[in-house]
Amino acid sequence: MGRIKENQSKKKTLLRDSKAYSDQAAAAVTSSDDGFDEPKEITAPKRKLPCGNSDAKKKKFKHPEANVKPPTLEEIKEIRDTRNLFHSNLFKLQVKEMLEELQLKPKYSNYIENWLETFTTAVHEFQDGLLDNCQLEVPLHLHKKLFNFQFLTPTAEPKLIGAAAIGTLLGPKLVVDVALEMPEKCFQKEDYRNLIFDQKRALYLATVASKLKELPACAADHFAYNYHANNPLKPVLELTPTGKIGKHLSLRLYITAPKAIFKLSRFVPWNNNVRPSFFGDKWDESETLPSTQHYNANVLFDLTLAENQKLLLSTFSGHRNFQEGLLLLKVWLRQRQLDVGFSGFSAHILAAYIVYLKQNRLLHQSSSSYQVARTVWNQLANSDWTQGITLCPQQPHQLSTLAGYYDVCFMDVTGYYNICANLPLSVYKAVCAEAKLAVELLNDVRVNSFSQIFMQASPLYTRMDNILKITNPATVDQLLELHVQPQVKYDYANYAHPQLLKLLTDLLQKGLGKRVHAILPLETASKSWTVDTKAPIIGRSLTLGLILDPEHAFEVLDKGPATNEDAEGAAEFRKFWGEKSNLRRFQDGSITEAVVWAAVTDAPSKKRLIVRQIVLHLLEQHLQLEQSDVHYIAGELDIIYSLTSSFKVAKLQTKLKLEQETDAEAVTPLVIHCYDALARQLHTLGDLPLDIVSISGISPVFRYCEPQPLLPQARLVADRMHAGHVLRVIIQLGPSGKWPNELGALRSLKTAFLIQIGKQLKEQQHLHTQLCKEGLLVLKQGYCFLLELAHTKEVALLKQQQTERGVTAYVDNAASREIERRHYILPRVSGALHALHQSHSTFGPTVLIAKRWLATQMIDDGLWPSIATELLVAHLFQQRQMPHTTVAPQTGFIRFLQLLAHSDWASELFLLNFNNSWTEQQITDLEHSYRSERDSYPALCLATAYDQQHAGRLWTTDDCPSKPVLGRVTLLARHALQLIESSLLSPSLGFVRPAQLFIASGEGYDLVIELKPDLLPNTLCYDLGSPFLPFSQRNFRLPLAGIDQLAKIVQQLRSAYSEYAAFFYNPHGGKELAIVWRPASEFAPKPFKVNELQACTPCSVGKVQVVRDTLVEDFKLLLKDFYLRICTPEQLKREQRSHNKPKRYFDDQSEPDVDKPQKKKKKKGTVTKPTDLKKRLKKSKSLSALC
């Protein structure tokens, strides 16, 4: 961790680092460091105005309306579109600005034109020759049939295709696609069969690459091969120019073929063009050869490319509105990563769909770019391509027939090529769901949806609740050889990825049924390789993401058909589920086959693993895969808030049913039930002067947000109450006009009420109570509650001030805001968060993981308020950035890290409109106030619908969290995301180990103060350890109720020495305090000033200086009995490397204390065996540190 800077320039740098990387879409086209010389600005000379004609000036401004030009037709149309199409002018301006940034600069277009001219000239100079002259590897990893191949010079000129041709190139790195057509004489009549066509394409590409490398103009360029859309039958040549321009632009060369070489009818879906003999398989001649519809579409892609490109050019060329509309759609699609890989929904499909809508008169030639994008989303959301759509005016074959061979059917202009041949139905439905969400966001006038639609990047893995990875080569071979049908192998030309995808998705979809919304492949783009190396084998692994249905995913029972009603169905059910299926009788009297996965009373964390249990069973039952053969990622981080095994639940004296393997989420209902019982008992108290109107719990546990497992272990020790956690409860009494008008008297009366409540609880309910400074402590069933009384008059008295003229004024201040927040606003927010957890059961566990992560990174409540974490997670669950709300806390935590890593803290206001209590006007006013008065709001701005006039300033302050802390958390979140993403997308790794995420880095700290372990209780959560110290002896001693002495001391250190040092510690059982010194300028000598002498020492005549060693002594004094020793992180590392344990506090040899009575000496003559002095724990002499 870098030093925390105080100066404003460093703070601005941290804020700049926290901006979302979704701006990369425009990074390339707006960069100035791109290898080109920027044109110099030419300033026009200013025209001198005559200064003596004052009458002319008067006449000029006498009738200003006479000099105003009337609006043009374009301006009138723009105003009308703004009113009719956009729900806010801000959204329109944001779209307009983004489109301006995405425009291709002339220098790039000029470079592309010049390169194409040079390449065309070079192609015409190519000489015919045999393949023997090619010195490069052929980019095709197949067993090739031996045939002679002669390179012939292309007869057609190279052409731009794709985005470069229709003017929709998109950064951050521009990829220009160029097509080079092979001569017709290169092919023979039978080349359409058995992959000969693909092999000739690859040979031709290798020859072209070899000839290009020999050209002086291309000698310095970087040559590499890659696969188009992860298709091993579609190698392309990637050329990256030398110099800085290569960072922003690259070119891809496609080899295509003329349409006339084969009849397109040879490639209809029901024809076979890959014979079984090609793979050495035998086939019964009496049987019909299996269809190879996907391989046929692969060949048709090349044969129909020119004609499809011509259709796209007719629609997009010269029509800026369609080009900009497609750019908007491409940004939207790329941010969701649904366009990646063999199974991706490519931008080419979007372009073709715009043409289809125009043909069907759903888009007009004069439609604006926004209308184009909105119409596409609206039509996609309500579309059904499974029945087939077509661009061909006269379709040669019926769509219903063609659609039967594909998941999704979208025929091209020829009527033979299915543009969506490789698109799985699940990916198509996911795109439709995203389009529907985009339309809903655009229709919601209460939010500015621009950021959610275009700017916020949401990688596909952040949408998955569970992930299945099959990466073992032996496992893949087993699946391909034993379980994949031969016709599937021929159809995909033995490409492993689509075969595995079809095999697994069909099985899992049948087994999971309504438990899942979707099963999507998670792909990464293939990496390029140099032209002198062999083509890599890709697709030998599979990663599937499961989006679960919260209503059905955690059902404990799968019920089959009744045996007496459907014997065949029952037999099939038994066969499918195997030994898991049993005949069961239900309460309604029915007797059916059923599979039970868990008990109804199981903890929520166990029920969330039901889908994992089902998937692993299906893989073992049908595919003979053991659990060790696959990586199933689900619930790996649940251990973070589970109960540590060091604490034995059996030792608790309680009547509650507790298991040793429990967690914070599972024990929370027990706490809430106890609270509800206490609330009922309080309502039954009859002898109070005023009735109790409402009782509200405000501690995090009442909203399922307490990461520490709260066990019933609070107790009385010598008439003093000891508890690890105190549960705060706010009580509001009925109205009365007899409350005093003086603050001290009112609080005294409140104390009297609490005494009366405690007395009646003891007499009527037999509960132990104890009065303290903050309220009334009540012990019930092993839990300690702190009761506070709330009265609106107290807030008014705190605001009351006397002016100089004796007039009473009511002014907000810190004390009044805190009372108003804790007594009136927090109960409502707590109730809203509790309701949010009831509707989204993942909210609570997500907060638990998030709080544990911040704590293990040594970010305590003094640096980052815990309520801020809860509200940020609630914001994630409230905003509709994704079609489906996650049901996995692990995924919710990843989305929380995304929010921390890519939020622009300087400009983003987090609004939580609970129950839609805020009107549109209120939201608009708050956003306007936030933008116009940004400096008056804290660095992290959170606002709820219950904040009243304090919106945006109630839950955080300027110092908590500060801008440096926000920058630090942003960097930590980005690093954690890198670890998670690299493990999830790795072909060989499973999920990241919790220890990699939940142990802070020991780098960057200057000093570490080790604290006495027996005075600091350990956390009840699963402890992953410290970055500085080894595990110490466990200590689960309960402190006095409501006392956290270490937190108070750290607060004192920060308030006194924050100008010179920053303090960090883990509030969940940390045994050390890490210190970072401020910059050296803070410790430089400075002139003597009376008001600036804190922590200063005289250093020379008239000057003073802050000395670090003196500050360390002050730290020791404040820590008192907690201090054990101080050292640097480097010293701790050396100790751990040398395995020489230092003299620890609990290893000290105890010496006889003169105050204690000495044991009697044994008489002489007695023989005793010599015994070694055993090391034993030396307890603190001053246990008052716990009080």
UniProtKB/Swiss-Prot annotation:
Region described as Disordered: 1-64, 1134-1187
InterPro entries given in the database record: NOL6/Upt22, Nrap_D1, Nrap_D2, Nrap_D3, Nrap_D4, Nrap_D5, Nrap_D6
Location(s), subcellular: Nucleus, Nucleolus; Chromosome
GO MF annotation, one: RNA binding
A cellular component term, taken from the record's GO annotations: condensed nuclear chromosome
One Gene Ontology term from the biological process aspect of the record: ribosomal small subunit biogenesis
Gene3D superfamilies: 1.10.1410.10, 3.30.70.3030
Keywords, in A-Z order: Chromosome, Nucleus, RNA-binding
Basic and acidic residues bias: start-end ranges: 1-20
Pfam families, per the entry: Nrap (PF03813), Nrap_D2 (PF17403), Nrap_D3 (PF17404), Nrap_D4 (PF17405), Nrap_D5 (PF17406), Nrap_D6 (PF17407)
Primary location recorded for the protein, binned into one broad class: nucleus
Domain of life: Eukaryota
Subunit description: Part of the small subunit (SSU) processome, composed of more than 70 proteins and the RNA chaperone small nucleolar RNA (snoRNA) U3.
Function: Part of the small subunit (SSU) processome, first precursor of the small eukaryotic ribosomal subunit. During the assembly of the SSU processome in the nucleolus, many ribosome biogenesis factors, an RNA chaperone and ribosomal proteins associate with the nascent pre-rRNA and work in concert to generate RNA folding, modifications, rearrangements and cleavage as well as targeted degradation of pre-ribosomal RNA by the RNA exosome.
PANTHER family: NUCLEOLAR PROTEIN 6, NUCLEOLAR RNA-ASSOCIATED PROTEIN
Family: Belongs to the NRAP family.
Descriptive protein name: Nucleolar protein 6
Species the sequence originates in: Drosophila mojavensis
